Each structure stands twice: as C-alpha cells, then as structure tokens.
C-alpha cells in the first residue's frame, strides 16, 4: 500500500464530491471578511495572552483556534462557523462568527458545589460585535452603535477571564 497516494486519492474524491455546493460571490466575500476579522482578534488575543503569561512564573492563559469541524461536532454549532477560545483557570471564553458582519463573545465559568464537584455555568454573552470594512480597515461597533477598539475589547475579555 502506498500511504501517501491513498491519502491524496481520498482528498481528490472529497473535492469531486463537494464541488457542486460552491458559495456565491457575496457569501465568499462575507467568509473572507469574517476570516480577516477573526484573525485580527486571534492575533490581538494571542499577543495579550503572551504578555500576561510573561508576567507570571507559570502562564495560566491559553488560546486555541477552533476548526469548523470542532464547532459542528463537539459544540453542536452548525453551518460554516469560525472561532477561537481563550482558556483560563476556571473560565472559558469563545469568540464565534454570528450572522453576517457579526461576531459574538461568550463566556463560561466553573462553579464549585463543594465535595470536589465543579460544573460550568451556562454560556453568557460577554459582547456582540458588528463590523464593516472601511478604507482604513475594519470599523467595530457594539450593539448600541458605539465604535470599539479591538485591543480594549480583548483587554476587557482577559480581565473577565482572570477575575475571581
């Protein structure tokens, strides 16, 4: 058996079987924009976590990019979804694409019920962000229409994640 050849054949077959469902140009543009926005927030969050962890003897924050398959299979979020998560001691924050030109940030925290029993709370929305492309890049706004700075958003999210 030629392992590499077999794997390549699997990939070719997958491409042939999924070629019929090509997205429209508008959908493709929307996907490109949300990918760019997620990358902006992923990079800023990664930078913030790196700076935070440098200040500690043992870094306690981590970040993970979430694949579409993970979001579908394990988190039961269907459709073409993008996201990443920030994991802190006792807290979990996930950044997800929402409707077109929107992303949502959800948080969960661990609750202790004594006797070593820990349960995560229901996810709560920390912020919903809308965005639009401009000549200078992207403009981010909250649900009231106020402009947002991505670094300030990430700073507040990290503060929430490390709070007791």
PLM regions and their residue ranges:
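Acidic, low-complexity proline/glycine-rich segments
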Residues: 1-17
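Generic alpha-helical secondary structure signal
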Residues: 5, 32, 151-152
